């Protein structure tokens, strides 16, 4: 079996008490068949740190983006986004998007920043990693306005209903599910996971957040992707092996990666 964690934040894991270092995290992951990890940046400063942190590890892929929580005051950060995203180690643009849950006061700034990421994605032909919280209508509208058919991407840790999923799927986007799908009360997410076609699903941990059952209350890590995979496979009446094969194919296709990645287990 070969699994890929399509979204996590490796630098935020607890390296004081839980892990001895990044290699320790990767070793634990491989024991659970998680062989490739996409670690996601949330700011330009964070991207520069991650570039050094992953130390050229072939099993760890990297994105470049500015999370809506970290809107830069300096416009030069936007120029840096475009410059650094062109780095050959970068396979995706983001994490970007809209988050109205914590901050309603800067909607316009979030939207401007999101549009810049979309334009960068189209220019560089690298997929978007999209964050949307309490903002699905604006997210969809902006993607349409920016001619998103020229770019591709994934809605990460998706928690919206089937209607929103259908619109995004018709626009060509992929849908990624995190440990939230394993929560007993996440009925909407369960139904959406059943609905999304198997050739358009990705899976993720969003480590160190959103630990799946049975690890709720414990810091999340890429190894726990295995449990999320098992849960969704059961929801879709698929064998874990077939589900793992298809989600890995989906990841490689979306991020335009060669199949030799699957020989790195």
UniProtKB/Swiss-Prot annotation:
Family: Belongs to the metallo-dependent hydrolases superfamily. TatD-type hydrolase family.
Entry's EC annotation: 3.1.-.-
Protein name in UniProt: Uncharacterized metal-dependent hydrolase bbp_325
Coiled-coil segments on the chain, per record: none
Keywords assigned by UniProt, alphabetized: Hydrolase, Metal-binding
GO CC term, one of those recorded: cytosol
Gene3D superfamilies found in the cross-reference section: Metal-dependent hydrolases
GO molecular function: DNA nuclease activity; metal ion binding
Enzyme class, UniProt record, top EC level: hydrolase
Source organism of the structure: Buchnera aphidicola subsp. Baizongia pistaciae (strain Bp)
